[in-house]
From Swiss-Prot:
This protein's name: Aspartyl/glutamyl-tRNA(Asn/Gln) amidotransferase subunit C
Keyword annotations from UniProtKB, A to Z: ATP-binding, Ligase, Nucleotide-binding, Protein biosynthesis
Top-level EC class as recorded in UniProt: ligase
Coiled coil: none
Provenance organism: Macrococcus caseolyticus (strain JCSC5402) (Macrococcoides caseolyticum)
Subunit-level organization: Heterotrimer of A, B and C subunits.
Domain of life: Bacteria
Record InterPro entries: Asp/Glu-ADT_sf_sub_c, GatC
One GO term (biological process): regulation of translational fidelity
UniProt cross-references to SUPFAM superfamilies, sorted A to Z: Glu-tRNAGln amidotransferase C subunit
Role noted for this protein: Allows the formation of correctly charged Asn-tRNA(Asn) or Gln-tRNA(Gln) through the transamidation of misacylated Asp-tRNA(Asn) or Glu-tRNA(Gln) in organisms which lack either or both of asparaginyl-tRNA or glutaminyl-tRNA synthetases. The reaction takes place in the presence of glutamine and ATP through an activated phospho-Asp-tRNA(Asn) or phospho-Glu-tRNA(Gln).
Reactions mediated catalytically: L-glutamyl-tRNA(Gln) + L-glutamine + ATP + H2O = L-glutaminyl-tRNA(Gln) + L-glutamate + ADP + phosphate + H(+); L-aspartyl-tRNA(Asn) + L-glutamine + ATP + H2O = L-asparaginyl-tRNA(Asn) + L-glutamate + ADP + phosphate + 2 H(+)
Amino acid sequence: MSKITNEQVKHVAHLARLEITEEEATKFSAQLEAILNFADQLEEVDTEGVEPTFHVLDLQNVLREDVAETSLTQEEILKNAAHTEDGQFKVPSILGGGE
């Protein structure tokens, strides 16, 4: 496994629109490398003859019944919002430049 560089960590952080320090990049680089090394170890485990497991527990579709309930009106929801426009929340752009 090749080493995860600080530059790679910074690039991923940039794509996620996260600002990280050089110290954090170094820390995350080491953590990511440890995770990938562990994944490599898992790949080496002999699973010949082991049945695939799709569900650890023998439960399927354990969901609550979908029941419609009364909820807040649009006015009630928007009344505490700092900014609204055309009946919707208006928030600052985080992507910038139309990205």
